[in-house]
């Protein structure tokens, strides 16, 4: 069927749109809003469910959003089976009767001055695929993939007609969700259209499956291009109809997502006005809330970015409400990193709202408005964590966690040690980007191209400091092992081989130069006192993860890398690989320090990053990473001492010569044994505000120090600030 894409244009001409003023776009002036949609039919709706969405009322939701001090409303207009407005393409749920939820919301939003954004689900269009089975994605065996649509099919024209319908209401913009290609096998798409277009582009047939060779490299590019073309095509169509209508796509280019979703970190983040991503302890961990925000920022530098968080205790699709302090912790973590935040409310099955939830939203949003002058300032970074999409795809392959663990472990170490950090992405990296960070860390970046090596060389020559861990640079462009590391010259060492173990050990003996003592700080194993012998000894400690044997050329070696013992059980493959064995013999140096130009490269032969995110996380492994940063960058602008349960974000406002230190106290109570998958548990939601001490030492002389909370106790002595904080979120303002 050919869709008439201009069917609704005449209707649009007479519509007064919400976003027609010359004022700043809604997303540039907003910090908090709500997304509201019904829940209960995610896996298939039925006309027998006449109660579903019966009370889902756009007018009531707009009023509730405005009363809770939300600055915009994202209202559900389309899910897999239903439309919640009068659509010619999809039926409405029977419970709505003659009501039009989108019309209700837009009319009320216009009265309230509340921008209304249409939430429109893209992937998993169940009803549409029942009507158009020819649009289904197909697996390598020619079988349709249940629920999935092919983005190269006629579905794009269908979606263009759908957005025309919704634009006619006068909405401020679209949030287009689920623009993925699936979150696991079976993979697509091998439909006739895809096969034809692939052959036209590459003059050869598609690979028969996931082959991890040259053909699969082309297939990955083809998949990425298909998603990009779909998004750009839809955005262009929307802007042609109404240039003021905003467009954002829900994004899955960040960990734990990989190639299977059809998105790269940068390629698929910038196809709208801003990127939207998600957080949530249930799906991403507490620690990754801030990481996701920085990832979205790095993917779209200079643009606003939106993060969605959920109301529910467990996940999106429950109707529970988290304690206020739990909501506050996630909300202010995201705002501190510079994003704007959409809180997702999934209504009751009948579409009704929970007044207790909106009372909590109102309390949290009121606090945001009180503090809004303290968000979205220039970040202060010390370390850039380098993320390689090529390593994700071709080293991680079907187990991307093998790569993610190092990246996330490096992040964990920086957070726990209160070292300001940001994210650097391989797709948009430049010398200017690198030079925003005094130190750049390559956490097991297995695949490093010649172009990247040249860029790192420029960065180091000019005074940059590079930290390299584990197997960085030891793989070819398709993940194949190399006989040498691409980083040999930078590291000042020759790659001799990779250990076939992950239970590797490090011993830190007396450093060859006194200035290297920094590497040993707060690592008791490096300075164990043997009372009976009357001497200080260095004791090996486990550094779980990949390890490489190096032979120094121009680098100074520090410490020892030790391989683990192996027994007969190992040779017979009867030993549990998750259980580490003790240290055996030394096989090479643990650390290499090489000076190039005005800068330096510090290499860990082992993987303290991987270890920090592992089940065998020792304090020593993260201290190694932190000490490396402090050795390479001894004159940090701020040194922050705080409990590991406190996250810190530092920003700068040059016009007022003010540094802001956001303090975020995570205070989840202990959890009990789970009913399944012991010992892996979700943390308990935060109920109580924590109390903790913080000490900050600044490089610049301070003129004044102020805390936002009256309860915070402050004491300043020159450039040293001590604070006692008793809240989830605090901001210390340091004027210099």
Region annotations inferred by a language model:
Residues 53, 118-169, 178, 194, ...:
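Active-site-adjacent "subsite" loops/lids of carbohydrate-active enzymes
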Residues 55-81, 169, 274, 331, ...:
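Catalytic domains of carbohydrate-active enzymes, especially glycoside hydrolases
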Residues 49-66, 153-165, 258-267, 323-331, ...:
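Short, acidic/polar
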Residues 66-101, 124-146, 150, 183-194, ...:
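Aromatic-lined carbohydrate-binding/catalytic grooves of carbohydrate-active enzymes
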Residues 24, 28-30, 105, 116, ...:
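Carbohydrate-binding surfaces of carbohydrate-active enzymes
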Residues 23-54:
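Boundary/entry segment of secreted carbohydrate-active catalytic domains
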Residues 47-68, 88-114, 157-158, 229-230, ...:
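Aromatic- and glycine-enriched glycan-recognition loops and surfaces
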Residues 26-35, 70-77, 98-142, 175-178, ...:
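Glycine-rich, aromatic-flanked loop segments that form ligand/cofactor-binding clefts
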């Amino acid at each position: 069927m050919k869709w008439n894409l201009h069917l609704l244009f005449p209707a649009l001409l007479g519509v007064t749109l919400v976003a027609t003023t010359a004022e700043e776009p809604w997303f540039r002036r907003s910090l908090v809003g709500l997304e509201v949609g019904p829940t209960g039919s995610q896996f298939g709706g039925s006309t027998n469910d006449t109660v579903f969405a019966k009370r889902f009322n756009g007018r009531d939701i707009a009023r509730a959003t405005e009363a809770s001090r939300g600055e915009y409303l994202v209202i559900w207009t389309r899910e897999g089976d239903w439309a919640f407005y009068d659509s010619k393409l999809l039926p409405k749920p029977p419970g709505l009767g003659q009501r039009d939820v989108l019309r209700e919301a837009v009319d009320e939003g216009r009265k309230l001055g509340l921008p209304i954004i249409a939430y429109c689900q893209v992937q998993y269009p169940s009803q549409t695929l029942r009507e158009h089975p020819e649009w289904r994605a197909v697996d390598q065996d020619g079988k349709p993939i249940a629920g999935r649509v092919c983005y190269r099919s006629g579905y794009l024209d269908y979606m263009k007609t759908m957005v025309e319908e919704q634009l006619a209401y006068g909405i401020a913009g679209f949030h287009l969700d689920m623009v993925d290609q699936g979150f696991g096998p079976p993979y697509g798409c091998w439909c006739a259209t895809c096969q034809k277009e692939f052959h036209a582009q590459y003059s050869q047939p598609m690979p028969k499956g996931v082959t991890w060779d040259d053909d699969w490299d082309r297939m990955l590019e083809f998949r990425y291009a298909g998603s990009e073309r779909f998004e750009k095509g839809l955005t262009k169509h929307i802007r042609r109809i109404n240039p003021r209508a905003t467009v954002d796509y829900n994004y899955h280019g960040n960990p734990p997502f990989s190639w299977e979703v059809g998105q790269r970190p940068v390629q698929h983040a910038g196809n709208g006005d801003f990127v939207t991503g998600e957080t949530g302890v249930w799906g991403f961990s507490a620690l990754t809330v801030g990481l996701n925000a920085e990832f979205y920022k790095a993917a779209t530098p200079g643009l606003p970015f939106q993060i969605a968080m959920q109301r529910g205790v467990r996940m999106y699709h429950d109707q529970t409400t988290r304690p206020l302090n739990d909501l506050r912790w996630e909300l202010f973590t995201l705002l501190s990193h510079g994003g704007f935040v959409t809180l997702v409310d999934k209504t009751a099955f009948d579409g009704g709202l929970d007044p207790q939830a909106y009372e909590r939203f109102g309390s949290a949003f009121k606090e945001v408005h009180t503090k809004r002058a303290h968000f979205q300032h220039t970040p202060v970074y010390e370390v850039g964590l380098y993320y390689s999409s090529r390593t994700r795809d071709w080293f991680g392959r079907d187990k991307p966690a093998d790569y993610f663990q190092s990246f996330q472990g490096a992040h964990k170490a920086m957070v726990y040690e209160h070292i300001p950090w940001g994210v650097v992405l391989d797709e948009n990296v430049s010398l200017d980007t690198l030079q925003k960070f005094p130190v750049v860390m390559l956490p097991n970046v297995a695949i490093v191209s010649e172009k990247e090596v040249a860029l790192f060389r420029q960065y180091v020559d000019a005074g940059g400091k590079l930290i390299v861990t584990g197997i960085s640079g030891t793989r070819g462009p398709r993940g194949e092992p190399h006989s040498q590391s691409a980083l040999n010259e930078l590291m000042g060492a020759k790659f001799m081989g990779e250990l076939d173990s992950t239970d590797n050990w490090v011993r830190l003996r007396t450093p060859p130069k006194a200035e290297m003592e920094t590497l040993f700080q707060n690592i008791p194993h490096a300075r164990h006192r043997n009372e009976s012998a009357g001497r200080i000894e260095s004791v090996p400690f486990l550094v779980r993860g990949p390890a490489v044997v190096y032979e120094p050329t121009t680098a100074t070696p520090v410490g020892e890398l030790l391989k683990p013992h192996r027994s007969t059980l190992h040779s017979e493959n009867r030993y549990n690989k998750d259980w580490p064995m003790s240290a055996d013999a030394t096989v090479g140096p643990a650390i290499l320090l090489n000076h190039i130009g005005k800068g330096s490269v510090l290499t860990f032969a082992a993987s303290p990053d991987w270890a920090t995110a592992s089940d065998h996380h020792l304090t020593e492994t993260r201290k190694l990473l932190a000490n490396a940063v402090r050795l390479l960058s001894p004159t940090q602008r701020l040194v922050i001492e705080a409990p590991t349960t406190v996250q810190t974000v530092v920003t700068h406002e040059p016009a007022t010569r003010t540094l802001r230190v956001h303090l975020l106290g995570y205070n989840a109570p202990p959890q009990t044994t789970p009913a399944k998958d012991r010992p892996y548990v979700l943390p308990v939601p935060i109920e109580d505000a924590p109390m903790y001490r913080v000490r900050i030492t600044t490089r610049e002389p301070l003129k004044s120090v102020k805390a936002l909370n009256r309860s915070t106790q402050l004491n300043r002595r020159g450039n040293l600030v001590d604070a006692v904080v008793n809240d989830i979120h605090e901001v210390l303002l340091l004027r210099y």
